[in-house]
Amino acid sequence: DEQEGCASGWVPFDGRCFGFFPQELSWRRAEGFCQRLGARTHLASIHSEEEHQAIMSMLASSQPYSESEEEVADEEVWIGLHRPMGRRHWEWSDGTKMDYSSWYREGFPRRRACAALEDSTDFASWDTELCSDRKPFICEYHV
């Protein structure tokens, strides 16, 4: 069927399903929210330019923000990339390997250990954010 096995409202890509959730949560709470949706559901991991494009177009079609709200809305969107306490390297919350990246800038402020899609570049790049910041997010599961 057309959904390729994804639940209603989720976007299929290459054997996985992506869902955008507009409620604003911290990175950890967003990951927990995704995990409660079902087995092996996590914040989204991105492994190719094509997958990134699919997520960007999903966000473009689902952004609920009107122009007037822009000042108050924190429009970056959490993905599953984080740097766990005491580790030097970035990791995806679903355990997949880091084989693609689209960082907004080089160099990472030490306190910012979670990554979000940057709305100022139409979600084409990632930036580091404080994990406690509350943002909308993308969950993903394998079909």
Curated annotation (Swiss-Prot):
Q: Name one GO cellular component term.
A: extracellular region
Query: InterPro entries from the xrefs?
Result: C-type_lectin-like, C-type_lectin-like/link_sf, C-type_lectin/snaclec_domain, CTDL_fold
Localization, UniProt: Secreted, Extracellular space, Extracellular matrix
- Please give the residue positions where the record annotates the modification Phosphoserine: S66, S68
Report disulfide bridges, numbered on this chain.
C6-C17, C34-C139, C114-C131
Residue intervals of the C-type lectin domain: 13-140
What SMART domains does UniProt report for this protein, alphabetically?
CLECT
Arranged from A to Z, the UniProt key words for this protein are:
Disulfide bond, Extracellular matrix, Lectin, Phosphoprotein, Secreted
GO MF annotations, alphabetized: carbohydrate binding
Per its UniProt record, what Pfam families does this chain match? Lectin_C (PF00059)
- Write the protein's name: Rheacalcin-2
Q: Which organism is it from?
A: Rhea americana (Greater rhea)
